[in-house]
Amino acid sequence: MNFPRASRLMQAAVLGGLMAVSAAATAQTNPYARGPNPTAASLEASAGPFTVRSFTVSRPSGYGAGTVYYPTNAGGTVGAIAIVPGYTARQSSIKWWGPRLASHGFVVITIDTNSTLDQPSSRSSQQMAALRQVASLNGTSSSPIYGKVDTARMGVMGWSMGGGGSLISAANNPSLKAAAPQAPWDSSTNFSSVTVPTLIFACENDSIAPVNSSALPIYDSMSRNAKQFLEINGGSHSCANSGNSNQALIGKKGVAWMKRFMDNDTRYSTFACENPNSTRVSDFRTANCS
């Protein structure tokens, strides 16, 4: 008999059991934790562990149009995220985030604005209106998301002027749990009042909202929150949009950030806070993230 080998197998079994117990303990102690322990592969995949369905909002209230994506089998209630596109753009530009985030345990609404020419402040107002309507649908028995949303846990995302709108939403609504603007633009770069954990996706070769006059000074202006700046190497203004070639990297970061701060799920801390150390990233900065 090979006792050393048997001993090693027993040690491995014990270690595996302890890890399973630890994962279960994390889920039990955090009422917001949803899904299995994350891995790099699971976060880089095009879909998470939950099945996703969607529906079009029949009567948008305070914004142009909306599509809601939601997990069917997450168990319990989940947080909600509103995502708004940029100047002249429609929700198709950011729709990839809908099923991606929903498959990891969020209710997500992607919206069209009343006018494609709306400015960041208007985009913020419409984004918050969309979140209010999600909360209303959560209380409507005929709604597909009836009883599925924890209305105390909400987040915002957006691209370009929608990113600027998301930053305004974060500044004006400190109860939001997380924000993730991509290639953000606003007439002001001072968001020093923001306390909401904020992840900024920037695009190195952005000629519409140049990094050094937009995303970076916005990041530098903030000091009261967990924050992160991730710049895509060689990326144009649409480097984080639907159809981009960086979805594995950006999706991993975006999902991990929302899970860490909207769900208070520390299983995602490493993925949310660490430097990806990828050739696709030309600049990375972070502070107060754990």
UniProtKB/Swiss-Prot annotation:
Effect annotated for changing H237A: Loss of enzymatic activity on PET bottle and on BHET
Record-level Gene Ontology MF annotations: acetylesterase activity; carboxylic ester hydrolase activity
Pathway in which the depicted protein is active? Xenobiotic degradation
Q: What is the effect of changing S238F?
A: Displays decreased enzymatic activity on PET film and on BHET. Exhibits improved PET and PEF degradation capacity relative to wild-type PETase
Q: Which domain of life is it from?
A: Bacteria
Q: Which residues form the signal peptide?
A: 1-27
Induction field: Highly up-regulated during growth on PET film.
Q: Could you say which residues bind poly(ethylene terephthalate) here? A: Y87, M161, W185
The annotated consequence of Y87A reads: Displays increased enzymatic activity on PET bottle. Displays decreased enzymatic activity on PET film and on BHET
Instruction: Relay the activity regulation note.
Output: Salts and glycerol enhance the enzymatic activity in vitro towards pNP-esters, while detergents and organic solvents reduce the enzymatic activity.
Q: Where in the cell is it found?
A: Secreted
Catalytic residues identified in the record:
S160 (nucleophile), D206 (charge relay system), H237 (charge relay system)
- What is recorded about the domains? PETase retains the ancestral alpha/beta-hydrolase fold but exhibits a more open active-site cleft than homologous cutinases.
> Its function?
Involved in the degradation and assimilation of the plastic poly(ethylene terephthalate) (PET), which allows I.sakaiensis to use PET as its major energy and carbon source for growth. Likely acts synergistically with MHETase to depolymerize PET. Catalyzes the hydrolysis of PET to produce mono(2-hydroxyethyl) terephthalate (MHET) as the major product. Also depolymerizes another semiaromatic polyester, poly(ethylene-2,5-furandicarboxylate) (PEF), which is an emerging, bioderived PET replacement with improved gas barrier properties.
Protein name in the entry: Poly(ethylene terephthalate) hydrolase
Origin species: Piscinibacter sakaiensis (Ideonella sakaiensis)
